[in-house]
Amino acid sequence: MSETLTPSAGAANNVVGRVTQVRGPVVDVQFEGDLPFILNALHVQNGDHTLVLEVAQEIGERQVRCIAMDTTDGLVRGTEVRDTGKQIMVPVGPATLGRILNVVGEPIDERGPISSELRFPIHRPAPSFEEQAAASEILVTGIKVVDLLCPYLKGGKIGLFGGAGVGKTVIIQELINNIAKAHGGVSVFAGVGERTREGNDLYFEMQDAGVIKIAEDGSTEGSKVALVYGQMNEPPGARSRVALTGLSLAEYFRDEEGQDVLFFVDNIFRFTQAGSEVSALLGRIPSAVGYQPTLATEMGALQERITSTKKGSITSVQAVYVPADDLTDPAPAATFAHLDATTVLNRSIAEMGIYPAVDPLDSTSRSLDPKIVGEEHYQVARQVQQTLQTYKGLQDIIAILGMDELSEDDKKIVGRARRIQRFLSQPFHVAEVFTGAPGKLVSLEDTIRSFKAVVAGEYDHLPEGAFYMVGDIDEAIAKAEKMKQEA
């Protein structure tokens, strides 16, 4: 590809400017000659490290306004700035596997430089219509509620929506555990504006799981995941670009090696939030709820690159923070339009102690179609949702009049729905250290078989507690037996 450059190609040209103003992460630079292009990377020496600036605006004939990719502490007016003549270029390829990179592609895992001659720009065009390929193969996650009610597609875009503390990151980590370990290809994880502690935990968990392999000599050969971090403490410039850096890494494996890539993003809302901060600093007039006026454009530019082509695929799982649990907020609303499957986490379900706290009636998937999942799966999923919806409709009557006022049929439906609700819970491998309960991975066949029997009323005689935090129906039966003996 013409844009795959070696470090020596397109070396820094001689266009030199000087810093005229520093306002937090926004830096104004004056040039005497030609101005650098928009999105060009500029280098400025700040103490003992090179600070990367990205050109965002031209202000007047001689000045450009830039966004800093790292802290500007210590930067003074008059400092010399060099135009690199190209965008921010990041190393790509097998050498990035097992490593942690920052937004500009520098290693931050203290394991020495990345020995890759291949580099990609972080801003790249989306694949054309001719290059794209439709996906219709189901990606089995081993999580019952997901596989049954909002199944994921290989090569699809998946969103995990939820407010603060309802379990988005835990589900992402469980998906990495269940899918990435069994996945033949490579994975890329972009940590966008989230907690540094979580990034640290994930790195060591991946080593324990064997997805990242570090030899005694420090080599990471045999690793299957690359990590790109721009965490909460980073300036908004880094947080608004780190998802693009991760995506460039994933695109290399898709386009150049023809691989099926898993791309995890935690959290896509922070990408929007950082864009909002940058927009305000650049003096743009804000739009609804204070977000940037270019919200839909920026989201589209990112999401349209995440797609399957005839060469390979990118399956993306994106956590989406929902401010104040309001799904109509412009940031989550802008993300909805791009997704193939949405898994919505509900605080009221989490408060009942049912984890994963997935809302079975709010979560949707384009692939819950008899042509894709098959007639049996489709019918079982719809019957489960119908039972839960009927129960939801009866809850007001139960709250006012009590269970005794219901008809016998309604009482059966309520009992069945409560069993289904509890059966949708599942112990996770990544939560094992906190709960002490071993994680369960349930096959799609077992999930369909189990729910088909429960929704048909075959297990109405078992106590509700037997369905809580188990794998398939056989475990629920065994738990019921144990409860009977202990009673």
UniProtKB/Swiss-Prot annotation:
InterPro entries: AAA+_ATPase (IPR003593), ATP-synt_VA_C (IPR055190), ATP_synth_F1_bsu (IPR005722), ATPase_a/bsu_AS (IPR020003), ATPase_alpha/beta_chains (IPR050053), ATPase_F1/V1/A1_a/bsu_N (IPR004100), ATPase_F1/V1/A1_a/bsu_N_sf (IPR036121), ATPase_F1/V1/A1_a/bsu_nucl-bd (IPR000194). The keyword Ion transport applies. It is found in: Cell inner membrane. ATP binds at G162, G163, A164, G165, V166, G167, K168, T169. Pfam families: ATP-synt_ab, ATP-synt_ab_N, ATP-synt_VA_C. F-type ATPases have 2 components, CF(1) - the catalytic core - and CF(0) - the membrane proton channel. CF(1) has five subunits: alpha(3), beta(3), gamma(1), delta(1), epsilon(1). CF(0) has three main subunits: a(1), b(2) and c(9-12). The alpha and beta chains form an alternating ring which encloses part of the gamma chain. CF(1) is attached to CF(0) by a central stalk formed by the gamma and epsilon chains, while a peripheral stalk is formed by the delta and b chains. This is ATP synthase subunit beta 1. The gene is atpD1.
